Amino acid sequence: MKLRITRFAFSVFASLIASVVVSAALTVATYNVENYTLANRMVDGVYRENYPKPEKAKAALRRVIGAIAPDVLAVQEMGPQPFLDDFQRELKQAGLDYPHAVLLEAADADRHVAVLSKVPFKAVKRHADVPLTYFGKPERVKRGVLEVVLATDQGDVSLFVVHLKSKYTERKDDPESALQRALEAEAVRDLVLTRFPDPARARFIVAGDWNDTKGTRPARALQKRGDTVIGTLVDAHDSHGETWTHTFRREDLYSRIDFLLVSPGLKPSVPGNGGKVHDGAGVAAASDHRPVSVVLDLTPVR
């Protein structure tokens, strides 16, 4: 009896360890799921107000996510908690089980950032009030910053999820909200540096929809402050070698505005061929964005 109990206890302990610590490879993806909430939209040629994401688009989302099979999925444009619960439940029904999920509700009442994961979070930090000064007045990063910590065989890895201000103009003296977006990026950068003052020794990812291209002030701000390198963008392309992640359908414009940025301390875990922009079946029907993913090599150093 004692032997059986000991074996059972060891089995439970081993199972717990396996469920908490990530070893070998970890696939991380970022995906703007385009209004997974109530929104005004065209549905089958009819304009609908406060209408949920159509079932066809939701089915396409699940197909896309299933093809990538990320271990950790950073999401933008998620609705309030009931919508995340619905998303998580329908993924599970499709054979995509993400038992760990967290949502950040910040200043934007309609669209939020979230993380779904196959592995448990060691820690969750909801940075809902990230301050900035905009035209002399105190403001905050509209959608906040969601941080989750994952335990791996090479040490903890932190994931910061952001969705910077869109290009919708809210003030005539800030066309396309360029200044607000840049200030948000700088506030996010300062938060990351507060958490990790020495990025060269840190292991983190900044993921999400930055609503600007890689040569712009927001993207530059997130990569470097003064002489301090915060991170580098993961090179990513689709099966045709194209790098765009967003389409503005009305104007037929294609751009890369969704990114995965890795700290210098985590960069050795990124494979030589970088990441991927998914262009498989269902991607056009699922969202106006394409997901970006990377497989991190977290094999313990011997």
Q: Model features per residue range: what roles?
A:
Residues 66-70, 74, 83-96, 121, ...:
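Sec-exported extracytoplasmic/periplasmic mature domains
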Residues 34, 78-79, 163-165, 210-213:
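Catalytic metal-binding/acid-base residues of hydrolase active sites
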Residues 46-52, 69-77, 101-103, 134-135, ...:
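Second-shell loop/turn segments in exported
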Residues 7, 21-94, 105-108, 185-189, ...:
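N-terminal, active-site-proximal structural segment of metallo-dependent hydrolase catalytic domains
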Residues 78-164:
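Structured beta-strand-rich core segments of catalytic domains in phosphoester-bond hydrolases
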Residues 1-17:
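Bacterial N-terminal signal peptides that target proteins for export
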Residues 153-183:
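Metal-dependent phosphoester/phosphodiester hydrolase catalytic core
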Residues 140, 190-205, 211-302:
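Metal-dependent phosphoester-hydrolase catalytic domains
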